Amino acid sequence: MDFYPVAIEKLIEEFAKLPGIGYKTAQRLTLHVLNLPSDEVREFANALVKARGTIKYCSICGNYTDSDPCAICSNPNRDESIICVIEQPKDIMSLEKIREYNGTYHVLHGVISPMSGKGPEDINLKGLIRRINENVKEVIVATNPNVEGEATAMYISKILKPLGVKVTRIAHGVPVGGDLEYADEVTLSKALEGRVEL
């Protein structure tokens, strides 16, 4: 049992709410922040507040952005005939690192997960359907290769095929049960190259 002042305990609790941060790590982060010079703490707090206040979702793809549309959607050099569907904005960063994909993206902000009570209406599928037009030739489904990701991929294929668009799935160079965020660049590159039609 720790005997920290209430303000320290509160900060530990807030850090512990972050994904992947347990009590011990939250405690270390809190103590580190308390040892920083006041101006650095203020900069850190201001950066959090500014990011939360200015960052929004792109109205086209759902990526994080500070201007709408985002830098990718407004880039005239991107191939708008290909849309890569991903689960979260962080997956865009993973795919952009390999510098082999020049299409656009669509962020679902989740996956279909009946066990978690998330159905198709709980993810950004309506936005994807709105984007399908005569200019879109292919939709690459790059959801994670786990049960929820596969279920989501199959559902997307089912709703898009009647619209006459080619639907492909990234190859499984990404390990089953893994996340795109943790895949290395070569694995992601091979997964994109080896995508298959659904």
Swiss-Prot record:
Origin superkingdom: Bacteria
Pfam families recorded: RecR_C, RecR_HhH, RecR_ZnF, Toprim_4
Entry annotated with the keyword Transmembrane: no
Location of the Toprim domain: 81-175
Cross-referenced CDD domains: TOPRIM_recR
Gene Ontology biological process terms from the UniProt entry: DNA recombination; DNA repair
The entry's keywords: DNA damage, DNA recombination, DNA repair, Metal-binding, Zinc, Zinc-finger
InterPro entries in UniProt: DNA_Rcmb_RecR, Rcmb_RecR, Rcmb_RecR_Znf, TOPRIM_dom, TOPRIM_RecR
Parts forming coiled coils: none
Any one Gene Ontology molecular-function term assigned to this protein's record: zinc ion binding
Residues in C4-type zinc fingers: 58-73
Annotated transmembrane regions: none
Matches recorded under NCBIfam families: recR
Role: May play a role in DNA repair. It seems to be involved in an RecBC-independent recombinational process of DNA repair. It may act with RecF and RecO.
Family from the record: Belongs to the RecR family.
Protein name stated in the entry: Recombination protein RecR
Organism: Clostridium novyi (strain NT)
Lineage: Bacteria, Bacillati, Bacillota, Clostridia, Eubacteriales
